[in-house]
From Swiss-Prot:
Residues 385-395, 584-594, 1564-1576, 1584-1604 have a biased composition (Polar residues). GO terms for biological process: regulation of synapse organization. The keyword Heme does not apply. It is found in: Cytoplasm, Cell cortex; Cell projection, Dendritic spine. It comes from Equus caballus (Horse). One of its GO terms (cellular component) is cell cortex. Residues 120-276 form a coiled coil. The modification Phosphoserine is found at S1526. Regulates the dendritic spine distribution of CTTN/cortactin in hippocampal neurons, and thus controls dendritic spinogenesis and dendritic spine maintenance. Associates with the striatin-interacting phosphatase and kinase (STRIPAK) core complex to regulate dendritic spine distribution of the STRIPAK complex in hippocampal neurons. Residues 1-23, 201-235, 360-441, 455-480, 499-617, 1447-1484, 1544-1648 are annotated as: Disordered. This is Cortactin-binding protein 2.
Amino acid sequence: MATDGASCEPDFSRSPEDAAGATAEAAKKEFDVDTLSKSELLMLLSVMEGELEARDLVIEALRARRKEVFIQERYGRFNLNDPFLALQRDYEAGAGDKEKKPVCTNPLSILEAVMAHCRKMQERMSTQLAAAESRQKKLEMEKLQLQALEQEHKKLASRLEEERGKNKHVVLMLVKECKQLSSKVIEEAQKLEEVMAKLEEEKKKTSALEEELSAEKRRSTEMEAQMEKQLSEFDTEREQLRAKLHREEAHTTDLKEEIDKMKKMIEQLKRGNDNKPSLSLPRKTKDRRLVSISVGTEGPMTRSVACQTDPVIESSDHVKKLPLTMPVKPSTGSPLVSANAKGNVCTNAALVRPGIDRQASHGDLIGSSLPTVPPPSANRIEENGPSTGSTADLTSSTPPLPNNAAPPTVQTPGVAPQSYSQASPMHSLHSPCANASLHPGLNPRIQAARFRFQGNANDPDQNGNTTQSPPSRDVSPTSRENLVAKQLARNTVTQALSRFTSPQAGAPPRPGVSPTGDVGTYPPVGRTSLKTPGVARVDRGNPPPIPPKKPGLSQTPSPPHPQLKVIMDSSRASNAGAKVDNKTVASPPSSLPQGNRVINEENLPKSSSPQLPPKPSIDLTVAPAGCAVSALATSQVGAWPAETPGLNQPACSESSLVIPTTIAFSSSINPVSASSCRAGASDSLLVTASGWSPSLTPLLMSGGPAPLAGRPTLLQQAAAQGNVTLLSMLLNEEGLDINYSCEDGHSALYSAAKNGHTDCVRLLLNAEAQVDAADKNGFTPLCAAAAQGHFKCVQLLIAYDANINHAADGGQTPLYLACKNGNKECIKLLLEAGSDRSIKTRDGWTPVHAAVDTGNVDSLKLLMYHRAPAHGSSLHKEEPESSIFDLDRQGEESPEGTFKPVVPADLINQADREGWTAAHIAASKGFKNCLEILCRHGGLEPERRDKCSRTAHDVATDDCKHLLENLNALKIPLRISVGEIQPGNYGSDDFECENTICALNIRKQTSWDDFSKAVTQALTNHFQAISSDGWWSLEDMKFNNTTDSSIGLGASSVRSITLGNVPWSAGQSFTQSPWDFMRKNKAEQITVLLSGPQEGCLSSVTYTSMIPLQMLQNYLRLVEQYHNVIFHGPEGSLQDYIAHQLALCMKHRQMAAGFSCEIVRAEVDAGFSKEQLVDLFISSACLIPVKQSPVKKKIIIILENLERSSLSELLGDFLAPLENRCPESPCTFQKGNGTAECYYFHENCFLMGTIAKACLQGSDLLVQQHFRWVQLRWDGEPMQGLLQRFLRRKVVNKFRGQVPSPCDPVCKTVDWALAVWRQLNSCLARLGTPEALLGPKYFLSCPVIPGHAQATVKWMSKLWNAVIAPRVQDAILSRASVKRQPGLGQTIAKKHPSQGQQAVVKAALSILLNKAVLHGCPLPRAELDQHTADFKGGSFPLSLVSSYNSCSKKKGESGAWRKVSTSPRKKSSRFSSPTWNKPDLSEEGIKNKTISQLNCNRNASLSKQKSFENDLSLTLSLDQRFSLGSDDEADLVKELQSMCSSKSESDISKIADSRDDLRRFDSPGNNPAFSATVNNPRMPVSQKEVSPLSSHQTTECSNSQSKTELGVSRVKSFLPVPRSKVTPCSQNTKRSSSSSNTRQIEINNNSKEEIWNLRKNEQVEKPNK
């Protein structure tokens, strides 16, 4: 706005007169007010004010002038002084006012205009001034802001300078540090180099050390083998000497026995009849004893020793280590000590060999205590003589146990760990040395009993009485009573022992121990005639109270029972070892289902009669010390633990090792509970060592009143001891309370049931005893019997309506107790009776908890699966093991199947007071089997938490954690599919569409990422496993996820993945977890589909055929690049399959690019003509007429089986147009109808051919240069490893994804089939019959059946008879019958072979069969011999071959390389054995191949010419010899001889297969010209190409070959280079090349090209001849 105003502002700086001109000029002149400064604005303002004043003055002047003009105008109008004025007046007055205009400008109007303009300008100036003032204010404010910003800028600039200074400092420091670090890096690099150098040195040293170590290991293994051999010889010799010694000892003993007999007879005659009765008994028993001593060191002795020396000792640590620590020493057995020391172990060293050196006894370990034993009275020695069986007269001396293996008081563990001196005499009781010399078959217990009862009659006890026993609670004896009892016992034992002269093997006692024995207040255990006056003696009628909670304490001896014969039954099991597992310390006899069962407990008592003299029982009392559990405890069928009241623990648990023995005569055994070791029990042991209380003898003999406690007590004792006779006598008395309970509440029925006396239980139940009478802890007889496992007692009690669900005070039911102790027969009976499984104890435990807590799988299975019969309580006797067996079997076969559990889920998940379920217990204790059974129950809740919020997984061991993690895991097979394979499609009959590679475990917590990784990893592992070299498991192989396998397959080869029927891709996620997804969709398998030809890929072809992907892609590139490709190789090399798959891949690629494509197949046979081929080309639009424009369609033509026709005849006319495909180079072809026309091949035509022939020959070689050839060699990839990979994949599929171990029979069978294929081809190549070579196709059908190697051998025999043998036969005949005309180069097999040819064929088949096929067969020799007859030609005698022609080898030949006939040793004039070529070679040029095998650095051109001349002359002489009727099989026979003469069978596969071996079979040593220099292996050898060794070939090479010759190879080239340019080398070069390990590769690698080269050269040189 200011500028607008200024632009119109006039300049009034002029004089007022010029004001009018100024207005005109003002428009032109403009001012820009905005550009003026303050001073200029002020000046302008003052000028304007001056102008305004000037205007005012002008206005006033103008007003004055106007006045004058007005007056003049008004009044001077008519003045005649001025004529002009008069004219003006007249003018104005003449016309109207409106029409007239003034003659001059009116000054007033001008003034008014000027004034109006001034007003406008004034207004404008005022607005401009106001704007200028506002701008001025704004400018002032901006200046203030600018100043502030300048100050801030200064501050920031200063701060920037400071920061720059700091940064400069930091940069300098960093530069300095960089320099330091770079110097450090250089130093570190130097150090690293030094360290690496040191590391290399160390590695070299380490490798050297490893080699030395391996050598040392080898040496040490050889030494060990030698030592083992010597040791075995020494062992044999020792056994022989020992047997001899035994015989001598037996003979000596017999002689001594005869001497003793004679002496005693003489003494008897002298003494007369008076002394005869007193001597007869000792003599009789002594004679028996000596007879038993005679063969004391033979085999069964070790069994008896093991019975006695191996009890598990748990109560005292120092006794634990005793049994095997000290060998028996002969010094312990001097006759004096043995006769006097009752505590001695081996008391008759003169007659007894001192024990067994491998078995140490308890008594051997107490030598320190022996000298302290005072000698006994002399009458003992007189009576017994040198008694081998005399033991210390301890309170528990050896009882008569005629049928058991050792004295039953093997309770040496019962010694409390108070002091060793107390325990040691106790050990002396049970030394095996006392029995070591006894009769080997006669039970050592019987021997011990015999000697005991003969020898201890007069031993004084501590009171001076000649009694065997210590003072017992009811003993106030007189000598007469003691003598009566002992005499009765002695008579009984004598009668019993007279029945046991035959050898007996007995089950050992199971030693028991009470760990709570209170020993400190008692005198030493071993009372060897020492007076112990501190022992309290109790009157006969006042028995001490039975210790609480210890039922069944024996307080009376049992009455006599005559069934001692039963002891001999079933020659008891010799399983006398001691199991050390807290449950059974001695193994039960094999004839019993239960270790604690009483043998014949039902039958024995029925025939007992009290009229017989009483027999000694096994009531063996213990010293008042109470430290050792008596024999009663040994025979006790079960004992309660001392710590816990009632039945909370099994009899065999850790706290109670009073283990029941196998008792042979039930009624004469008095069980005693473990409480006999408790305090206060010292005088409660009743019976003397003979088993009879003297005060009880009159009662039993006369029927008078027993001087014991009351009848109820006696009733309980009889029931506890199983004394059926006494029990029946007592039950017949009137007024007897059969339900009387002792202070523990134990009734007679309870004691009998607890100890397993079935007959006593039956008697008491028939007498109407209370069946459910409970003790003070609430346990009934059924509880006791179930806890102890006495299932017959349980059966009886259930039959008498015992309460099967009775719960004790702690809530334990009989079923709970049976489960707690693992008594499965009792569990089964209780369940069949309808016992409730869900009753809980006070702690909240059910029977399931109890079964799981002990880890008893059978108990748990019964609880979960055993159904109660429909008819209720079943008491029928069944096989006790049958249901368990069926259960196991069904459980294994179908864990979730038809065998469903009968317990509800609530019971399985029942928690105790701590919140622990059965699964918690099983998992925490590591009972994996129990946890597995629980997991099979569908209702198990593994996630249930205890009161500490822990699941079963939280408390589980590692094994159980793994089980729980996989509890609900889905095992889904992962399969690889290659799509549909058309049946019979070009050799793909043996290919499989799908292969199972593994099973994926999908858990509940598995995420999709984990699942995707698992699938990818499984695929990668599988591809690498099938392409690896050896049988390595997936765990052993270090797989790399990033790299593809050696066959080129990897995760990128996958086209799609389907989960069941739902498509899925790696990395894809669904809303559900994989576990839920699989369950919901019921996905039974995961299928991975590989990319195939339909997608333009070859991955599925690679996986199907096991040809590496890189090679297939290379073949495809060759076809696309060269358009004309022929695949050739031995028959069965999958040529047709490869060509067809490549064609399919190309077709789909072209179609994807928008082209139409067609595949045309033509199978060529002998009648296929060139005209037919022309028609084929024309009809398929490959050949296009010249006038016609080319088509855009792509055509792929496959010509199969070209070997059946002549290549030159069939394809000869097409070679030029195929190479030059354009209309400019047409060719005239004649159609099948006879018309001819010009055609050309267009660019979009691809031609593939297949030839099932190892090499070309003759005129067919002309075709070679016009095609690109792909050679499929049997000894080179892809064929070499194809069979191995294919069979490995087959095995992996058969084992459902697992790779079996290398020692698995399946692996050995597959390796054998693979070796057969390789060895066959190796031998056939060596025999010079390449047309018989086989590709791997025939071996792809090898059956893989685990456990049936015979099937593979049968398959091999069929393959041999149908394919291999006919081909070999034809090839051998064709080679042995070459046409007589030279130069034709064709072989024709004779239709009627001569006898010599037939013999050669048979020999060749037999040698091939033995060397290549049967060698290495995994079947045993016997089975293999049965299958040998199935192979054709296997019966030919090889001796005929070896004797066909004498062919000696030279000394220079190494053993590893059987180089027979590998070098030319004959001149042409003395060519005695002809050289045979392959059938596809002419006779010419063959010698040259063997002579000029290597490129020697000598005149190549000269040598070339000479070699051909040599060659032709040799061949001519050969043909002349044929025409003379030579033996044309000699050559083959010599080669066969060389194959036979190889020492090692496997040498066939190692024999070098070089070209000379294919064709040279002359005998060595016949060529003096060449044999002069045989030993110069260092001839310079030039190589054009070195063929690499494949891994298989390298392993096949012999170790004895020369290492320096590994690189020797021949020229390998696809170009037609004449082989004759190679110089003929001297003999030494020939030798070195023949021993090179590359010979094996070279035969097949180069045979075809070289043959072609030969042919071309021959054809060039033939006209020159």
